[in-house]
Amino acid sequence: EENIFKLQVFCYDLHMIRRDVVPVLKKLASQYPVVTITGPRQSGKTTLAKSLFTNKPYMSLEDPDTRRFALDDPRGFLSQFSHGAIFDEIQRAPDLVSYLQSMVDKSPEPGKFVLTGSHQFELMTQVSQSLAGRSAVLRLLPFTLAETHRLKGSKQHLNLSQQLLTGFYPRIHDRKLNPSQAL
């Protein structure tokens, strides 16, 4: 399997439930230079990207200093990542996507960049315009029922009404939060 998937089993097994989309994400990253993971906040995009692409530097564009650098000097910012990176919350620096296009055109290795973002419309507009044909898009939603069953263990399935009350967001299950107080 490609070197872009250096899965840290310890971290993956203890801190993250196996997501059903992992095989799809691996396949997309082996075919496209950019993979964009979209979905609602707290659905597990960052955890998935960081746990699957452990050999890539991670940059959160939520961080004000990182975002300022990316916005003020996009070429300088991207020059640090000639071998690729994970850019989390890419919608916070949407112009960066245009600069990524030229980098990917010069060096189109599969799985080079992983982008994550929560604002579907804004992000998809940028990606579809600047990275058309260069990026695969994966929509990550909160847990499926099957994923929550794996988390609970096969003997501890919640009934449907309990499951609906608890919800499907990973943080609730991961940290065993009270769902009525967590959201």
Tell where the protein language model's regions lie, with residue ranges.
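Phosphate-binding site recognition
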Residues: 1-183
